[in-house]
Amino acid sequence: MDINKMTYAVQSALQQAVELSQQHKLQNIEIEAILSAALNESESLYKSILERANIEVDQLNKAYEDKLNTYASVEGDNIQYGQYISQQANQLITKAESYMKEYEDEYISMEHILRSAMDIDQTTKHYINNKVEVIKEIIKKVRGGNHVTSQNPEVNYEALAKYGRDLVEEVRQGKMDPVIGRDEEIRNTIRILSRKTKNNPVLIGEPGVGKTAIVEGLAQRIVKKDVPESLLDKTVFELDLSALVAGAKYRGEFEERLKAVLKEVKESDGRIILFIDEIHMLVGAGKTDGAMDAGNMLKPMLARGELHCIGATTLNEYREYIEKDSALERRFQKVAVSEPDVEDTISILRGLKERYEVYHGVRIQDRALVAAAELSDRYITDRFLPDKAIDLVDQACATIRTEMGSNPTELDQVNRRVMQLEIEESALKNESDNASKQRLQELQEELANEKEKQAALQSRVESEKEKIANLQEKRAQLDESRQALEDAQTNNNLEKAAELQYGTIPQLEKELRELEDNFQDEQGEDTDRMIREVVTDEEIGDIVSQWTGIPVSKLVETEREKLLHLSDILHKRVVGQDKAVDLVSDAVVRARAGIKDPNRPIGSFLFLGPTGVGKTELAKSLAASLFDSEKHMIRIDMSEYMEKHAVSRLIGAPPGYIGHDEGGQLTEAVRRNPYSVILLDEVEKAHTDVFNVLLQILDEGRLTDSKGRSVDFKNTIIIMTSNIGSQVLLENVKETGEITESTEKAVMTSLNAYFKPEILNRMDDIVLFKPLSIDDMSMIVDKILTQLNIRLLEQRISIEVSDDAKAWLGQEAYEPQYGARPLKRFVQRQIETPLARMMIKEGFPEGTTIKVNLNSDNNLTFNVEKIHE
C-alpha cells in the first residue's frame, strides 16, 4: 500500500481512521474506521455522492460506529493502537487500486474507495441496497470525464457549481429582485454576446449604478424567453473569484481550479455564459513567481470565442488594471453604464416596492419612494443612484420593522410604572404604621388603574399586531402566486397560468384590499395607531439626516420656534451688529424652508470691520445656535496660508507629494460634516491666489479635491472675516453708529484694491461691522459677567456687580479701535484677579454671594454679602 499514490482526501481519511482505532482501543485499522472517516471528512466527496443518491448518511455513519464497537478492545501497557491494517481494510484498498486502473487514474481517490466499499463491506451494501447503478451514474457525472492526475482532484469536480452560482436558476426559484429599465444596456450586451468572436461584453460604470443588475436582467429575460433564439438555451453563471482563490494551499492549485471551471464552460459548447463581477481582480490573481495569472489564462479562450464572458468593473479600476493589459482589453467590448436620473430611479423603486414590502412586512407610500430618489440625489453626493436611493428605502423599512417588533413607547412607560408600583407595594406590605397603610391603600388604587390601562393598551397592541400579521401573510401569498404565474407562463403551462391569473391572484388582491380597508377603518389614521407599519417620506428624511447631518426632515415645533427667533438668539451673543445678524439668520431660514438656490451654498458673507467688534463671534454663535455646539464650525485661520503653495493644504497635496492620502483640511472637514458653518478668519492675511479656489465654492457650491472627488458645499454657510477698511470705518463713523454712504464707498475701494472682482461678485453680501459704542460696551460687560458667573457656579459661588460698577468698567475699557477685547482684559484685571486672590486667601464656603460696588475714589470694592445655609 503506497500512501503517495493516494489523494490528499484519502490520506486524511486514513489518518482519521488511525485516530478512531485509538479511541476504540483497537490494534487493527478496521474497514469501518476508514469508511466512517471518509464519511466525516470536510467537503467529503464520499458523503456528497451518497446524499445525492438519497441514502441516509447519518444512519450509515451510526452503523459504522456500531460495527466498530463490536470489535474486541485491547487494554494494557505499551500497546500501540491502530498500527496494523486489518485484512478486510487491506482488501478495500486493493480493490480501490484496481478501480483506479479501470478509470485510468494516477491516484486512489474517494470515488474508488466508495466503489470498493460497495463491493466488499456488508454494512455499505445493506444501506446502498439496489442503488448501485444510480451511484455509478452520479460518480460519472461528478467526474465529468476528468481523470485523477493530481492529489487534489476534487477541485476539478463540478467546479462551476462549487465556485459559481447559476443566476438563471435563481431567477426560476424567485430569489432575485426584478430589474426595472436598463433596456438599452441589456440589448447592447445581447448584441455583443451574439457575435462569433470577441463576444465578451464588459460593463463599465460607477459603483452602485446597476452593472450587476444588467446581468440579472439578462438572466430574467432568458427565463422569460425574451431573448434572441441564439441565447434561449443559455445559462448565466456568476464566478466567485474569492472562493476560487480561498484555500488554494499548494502551488498551481488556483490554476487547476480555474482550468477546471474553464473546461466546464468550454465543454458546454457555448451554453454557459460566465459572469465575472469585479473583473479587474483577474489581472494578477494567482500570480506567484513564474506562475501565470488568471487574466492570461483567459485570453486564448476569449479570443477564439470559446468562452462567453461578461465582466463588470468600475471606471477607475478598468483604467488601472484592464487598460494596462491591452491584449486583455481588446478581447472585451465595452458597455457604458451611466447613472440613472431621478425619474428613472423612482421607476426602479416602484418596481422593487412590493419585494421590500413583503420582506419587511411594512407598507411603503409612493411619496416615500419619490423622497428617497430626490433627497439621495440632492444630499448624498459621494454615492450613485439607484443604489443610494434603494439603501434609503431599505433602511427606512428596517427602522419601521424594528419598531413594530418592540413595544410602543406608551405601553412601555405603563409597564415600567406598573413594575415600579409593584415593587413599592411589596415594600409597604411589611410596614405596620398607619401612614404606610394609608400610602399602601392609595398605591393599590393607583396600581389597579395602571393595570387596567396596561391591559387595555396591551389588548390594542396585540389586536394591531394580529391585523398587521394577517396583512403580511396575504402580501406574501400574493407574491408567491405572482412568482408561480411567471413560472407557469415560462413553462407554457397555460391551464395553471390561467387559473392563477384569472382566479387566485384577483381573489388574493381583493382579500388584501378588504383587510387594508378594515384595518384603516378600525384603527383610524396612521397617527392614531399604536404600531406604525407605514414608511413615509418623513422616515426617509430622518435617515438622510442621520447619514449626512443635514436637517431635511419636516420641521418639528421646537425647531420652528428656534428658527423664527434665530436673530434674537444671535443678538444675545453679538452686540450692536443688527444688519449682520439679520442677513445671516435670513439665509438660514431660507435654506431650512427649502427655497434657497439648491446649487449654491446656504449663504456666503464677507464681514468687514475693526478688530473685536463680533465678526468671529457671530460665526461661533451661529454654529452654536444651529448645532448646539461651536465644534460644528470649520475654522480655517487664513494667516496660515500666506504662501502661494499653501492652497494645497485646503484641497490636499497633489499626487506624488507627501500627504496626498490625507486629503485637504477644508475638503475633508466638509466631506465629514456637509452641514456646517465655515469660518475663513482674517482672509486678507492669505496669499491672493488662495482665493481662486473659492470661486467654484461660492458660485456652484462644489470643490474638487486633489483626488478628483467632488466635495459638496451646498449645505454650508461660508463666512469670511477681514480688517480691510477698518481704519476708514473708525475715522468716519457717525456718533449714532451709522455708516455713511461715503464711508461705505471708501471701504469698498480698499476692498477692490485687494480682492479680484470675480470673488466679490460671487458673495451673497459684504457686511460692514460698525465700531462699538459706549452703550454696546455696557451690554458686553453684562455678557462677560454672566460667563464669569457660569464658571463660578461650579464652586457654588456667585458674584453681583452694581450698575455703577458696570458703567465704570465699560467707560474705562472703551477703545473704539480695539473693540471688546480690551474690556475682557480689563474685567480680568479689575474683577477676576482680586476675586481669585480672595478665594485662595479666605476660601469661601458654598452658597457665598460676592457683591462688587464702585466707591467714591472710582475703585471697586468686594463684599461677602450673604451665605446660604
Curated annotation (Swiss-Prot):
Pfam families: AAA, AAA_2, AAA_lid_9, Clp_N, ClpB_D2-small. One of its GO terms (molecular function) is ATP binding. CDD domains: AAA, RecA-like_ClpB_Hsp104-like. One of its GO terms (cellular component) is cytoplasm. Residues 559-771 are annotated as: NBD2. Disulfide bonds: none annotated. Residues 6-71 are annotated as: Repeat 1. Gene3D superfamilies: 1.10.8.60, Clp, N-terminal domain, P-loop containing nucleotide triphosphate hydrolases. Residues 772-869 are annotated as: C-terminal. It comes from the Bacteria. Residues 158-339 are annotated as: NBD1. ATP 2 binds at G609, P610, T611, G612, V613, G614, K615, T616. Residues 390-524 form a coiled coil. Residues 85-145 are annotated as: Repeat 2. One of its GO terms (biological process) is protein refolding. Keywords: ATP-binding, Chaperone, Coiled coil, Cytoplasm, Nucleotide-binding, Repeat, Stress response. Residues 3-145 form the Clp R domain. Residues 340-549 are annotated as: Linker. ATP 1 binds at G205, E206, P207, G208, V209, G210, K211, T212. It is found in: Cytoplasm. The Clp repeat (R) domain probably functions as a substrate-discriminating domain, recruiting aggregated proteins to the ClpB hexamer and/or stabilizing bound proteins. The NBD2 domain is responsible for oligomerization, whereas the NBD1 domain stabilizes the hexamer probably in an ATP-dependent manner. The movement of the coiled-coil domain is essential for ClpB ability to rescue proteins from an aggregated state, probably by pulling apart large aggregated proteins, which are bound between the coiled-coils motifs of adjacent ClpB subunits in the functional hexamer. Belongs to the ClpA/ClpB family. Part of a stress-induced multi-chaperone system, it is involved in the recovery of the cell from heat-induced damage, in cooperation with DnaK, DnaJ and GrpE. Acts before DnaK, in the processing of protein aggregates. Protein binding stimulates the ATPase activity; ATP hydrolysis unfolds the denatured protein aggregates, which probably helps expose new hydrophobic binding sites on the surface of ClpB-bound aggregates, contributing to the solubilization and refolding of denatured protein aggregates by DnaK. Homohexamer. The oligomerization is ATP-dependent. This is Chaperone protein ClpB. The lineage of its organism: Bacteria, Bacillati, Bacillota, Bacilli, Bacillales. The gene is clpB.
